[in-house]
Amino acid sequence: MPAQIDIADARFAYDGEHEVLHGVNLQIEEGSYVVILGHNGSGKSTLARTMNALIVPDEGSVSACDLSSADPDEQIEIRRHVGMVFQNPDNQMVTSIVADDVAFGPENLGIAQSEIVRRVDEALEAVAMTEYAQADPTELSGGQKQRVSIAGMLAMNPDVLVFDEPCAMLDPRGRRGVRRVMRSLNERGMTIVHITHFMEDALDADVVHVMDKGNIVLSGTPDEVFAHGDLLRSLGLEQPFAMRLAHALRARGIDVTDTARLPELEEQICRLAGIDAEKGE
């Protein structure tokens, strides 16, 4: 199966001198859930912007949905297929009513009003924000605002959604809500690319790529990637809390196995203690 997004030897420098991307190669398959991890300055957000032609590499190539970002005539079409959700939802709010904000993109495409209404209704339902359709976006929580931003992208009917640090400004509850939306969209068949520095965000992924200094330095499933604790720490990243806790327990002689998922670790501990994890007794 050909890649839905194909990045080949991509190089890019903002000032024409200091490269941010150093020959990156990445293929993203249709319907996959991909997480790109990295500390600030690793190049992950720049890479994300190449996926919908907001940035065109100085060298190498990027194709999305069989369209080339190097062709100016195809760049707008790429952005219809590949939507982006950014870190600060306030920067994507353009009206004083939630439903109107979601409708803004389709209206600019000249779509018929009846179709816009249908898309807005479906998009708000997909992010569990239907009851806020007539609300003022400025009165919503950070997590709710981000879900409205996602709805605005969904109303454009993209094939791929790229999330660039969408949870960076949210509290844990808001982060969980946005992650639930991303999982739900992926379960419906949409390709999800999540750019993040939160380790727990990567647990939902099919594939995780770790970036450092403009290169992808590690790839694999979440469990495969998080098994490289020493490498992650050298890159300024940490293993998920559950895996760090498992290591600490083993150091104290408690026989648990590595897992990045807290519920799995809780089940192991309960089993060792002779406790029914579901009943708590």
Residue positions per predicted region:
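Conserved ABC ATPase signature
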Residues: 136-140, 144
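Conserved ABC ATPase "signature" region
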Residues: 114-132
